[in-house]
C-alpha cells in the first residue's frame, strides 16, 4: 500500500467520529438500561468463537456472512461473529444453565464479509434481547412490546413493524406434498412477490384445486390487520397449524392495539426472512428512507439442541448505528467547563468536585491555543475572591 493510501479503510468498514460516537454511546446506554428495566440481564459475548458453535442452527447464510480465521493456539477454525443471537443461545444452554425463564440482553459489534445493502456498514453495532425457556405466546408479545418501546426510547420518527408467521407457509408446503426442488422454486418466487411467475408455477406443479387456491393467495395476504380475517376464512379447510398461526397473529394484534394504539402494524403471511432459522412468529421494524429493516426478530426454538439443552426462545436484534442516524445528525452542543490554569492553588479540588458531579472539565495544556468550541466548552472556571466559580464563556 502506498504511503498516501494508508489512511484508507476497507469498503464497508467505518470509524465513528466524536459527535456521532457520543450520540451512539448515549443511545446504547439508554437502550441497555431499558432492557434491564424489563428484567433482561446484560451479557458480553466474545468477538470470536470456534466456527462450529458460532454457526449452530444459523444456516448457510450465516456461514457466508462470517469471517473465518485460524486459531494460532489450537489450529481450529474460528469465526468473527456476524450475529450475537447464537452466542446468547450458547450462554443460556451451556454457560448459565438456568432453570425456567432466562432473559438476556447485549450490545456489541458484529462483522459481515459483505454489506447487507448499498452503502451499508460491514461492522454494525447490534443491540438486542433474547428470552429463553418460554414457548407460549406471552413471550413473543413481550419481546415485540419491548421492541416498540426500544424504538420509542430511541426517538424514532414514523415507522412500522412487519409481522408474519412461518407456520403458515410451513404447514401449507407440507400439505402440498411437493419435492424439495419444487419448494425451493416456489419459495424464491414468493419472496420476490412475482405474482405472474407464481401463477405459472402453480399451474404446472399443483393439481389439487384447493391447494392451488391457497398457494396463489399467499403472496397477496399482506396489509393491515384485516388480512388476518381474510386468511382465516380462506384457510378454513387448511391444516390446523395454519389456523393456529393466524390465531397467534390475531392475539398479538389485539394486545398491541391495547398497549400501543398508535403503532403501525403490517401483516405479511408470505414474509419468510430467516425461514430456515425461525420457527414461529417473525417481525421486523422499518423506518422511512431505509430499505433494510432496522430490527429483526422472532421465535427460534431448538437452537440450543447442539449445546445439549434445547430451549424455547424468542428475541430481536436491532442496528444501533442505523437507529442513531435515522434520529438525526445533530452536533453536540458545547457543555463543558474550560480550565485555563490547572496549576492554580486549590483549583484541583474544585476540578475533581465538578467531574464527580458529572461535569465535563477540560484543562488547558501548556501552549494550548485551540478555541473553546473544539473542546466542547461553553463555560470556564475562574477565581472570584477566594473561591473558584463556573462562568459562561462570552
Swiss-Prot record:
Gene Ontology, cellular component aspect: cytoplasm
BP term (GO), one: histidyl-tRNA aminoacylation
Pathway it works in: Amino-acid biosynthesis; L-histidine biosynthesis; L-histidine from 5-phospho-alpha-D-ribose 1-diphosphate: step 1/9
Keywords: Amino-acid biosynthesis, Cytoplasm, Histidine biosynthesis
Coiled coil: none
Record bears the keyword Transferase: no
Superkingdom of origin organism: Bacteria
Localisation: Cytoplasm
GO molecular function, one term: histidine-tRNA ligase activity
Oligomer and partners: Heteromultimer composed of HisG and HisZ subunits.
Family: Belongs to the class-II aminoacyl-tRNA synthetase family. HisZ subfamily.
Functional note: Required for the first step of histidine biosynthesis. May allow the feedback regulation of ATP phosphoribosyltransferase activity by histidine.
Note: This function is generally fulfilled by the C-terminal part of HisG, which is missing in some bacteria such as this one.
Name recorded for this polypeptide: ATP phosphoribosyltransferase regulatory subunit
Amino acid at each position: 500500500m502506498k504511503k498516501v493510501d494508508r489512511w484508507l479503510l476497507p469498503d464497508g468498514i467505518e470509524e465513528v467520529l466524536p459527535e456521532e460516537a457520543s450520540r451512539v454511546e448515549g443511545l446504547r446506554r439508554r437502550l441497555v438500561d431499558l432492557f434491564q428495566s424489563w428484567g433482561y440481564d446484560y451479557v458480553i459475548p466474545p468477538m470470536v468463537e470456534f466456527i462450529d458453535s458460532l454457526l449452530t442452527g444459523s444456516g448457510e447464510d450465516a456461514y457466508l456472512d462470517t469471517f473465518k480465521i485460524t486459531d494460532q493456539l489450537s489450529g481450529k477454525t474460528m469465526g468473527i461473529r456476524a450475529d450475537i443471537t447464537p452466542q446468547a443461545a450458547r450462554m443460556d444452554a451451556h454457560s448459565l444453565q438456568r432453570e425456567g425463564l432466562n432473559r438476556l440482553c447485549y450490545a456489541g459489534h458484529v462483522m459481515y464479509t459483505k454489506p447487507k445493502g448499498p452503502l451499508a456498514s460491514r461492522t454494525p453495532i447490534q443491540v438486542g434481547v433474547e428470552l429463553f425457556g418460554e414457548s407460549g405466546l406471552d413471550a413473543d408479545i413481550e419481546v415485540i412490546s419491548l421492541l416498540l418501546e426500544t424504538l420509542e426510547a430511541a426517538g424514532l420518527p414514523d415507522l412500522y413493524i412487519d409481522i408474519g408467521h412461518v407456520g403458515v407457509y410451513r404447514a401449507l408446503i407440507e400439505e402440498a406434498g411437493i419435492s424439495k426442488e419444487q419448494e425451493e422454486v416456489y419459495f424464491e418466487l414468493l419472496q420476490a412477490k412475482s405474482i405472474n411467475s407464481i401463477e405459472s408455477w402453480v399451474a404446472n406443479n399443483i393439481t389439487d384445486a384447493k391447494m392451488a387456491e391457497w398457494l396463489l393467495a399467499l403472496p397477496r395476504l399482506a396489509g393491515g390487520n384485516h388480512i388476518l380475517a381474510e386468511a382465516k376464512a380462506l384457510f378454513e379447510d387448511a391444516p390446523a397449524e395454519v389456523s393456529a398461526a393466524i390465531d397467534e397473529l390475531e392475539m398479538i394484534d389485539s394486545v398491541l392495539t391495547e398497549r400501543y394504539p398508535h403503532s403501525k402494524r403490517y401483516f405479511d403471511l408470505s414474509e419468510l426472512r430467516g425461514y430456515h432459522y425461525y420457527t414461529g412468529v417473525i417481525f421486523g421494524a422499518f423506518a422511512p428512507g431505509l430499505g433494510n429493516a432496522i430490527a429483526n426478530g422472532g421465535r427460534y426454538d431448538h437452537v440450543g439442541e447442539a449445546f445439549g439443552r434445547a430451549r424455547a426462545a424468542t428475541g430481536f436484534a436491532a442496528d444501533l448505528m442505523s437507529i442513531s442516524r435515522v434520529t438525526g445528525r445533530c452536533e453536540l452542543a458545547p457543555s463543558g467547563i474550560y480550565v485555563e490554569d490547572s496549576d492554580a492553588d486549590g483549583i484541583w479540588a474544585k476540578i475533581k468536585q465538578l467531574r464527580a458531579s458529572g461535569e465535563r472539565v477540560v484543562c488547558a495544556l501548556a501552549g494550548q491555543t485551540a478555541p473553546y468550541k473544539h473542546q466542547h466548552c461553553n463555560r470556564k472556571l475562574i477565581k472570584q475572591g477566594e473561591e473558584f466559580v463556573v462562568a459562561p464563556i462570552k
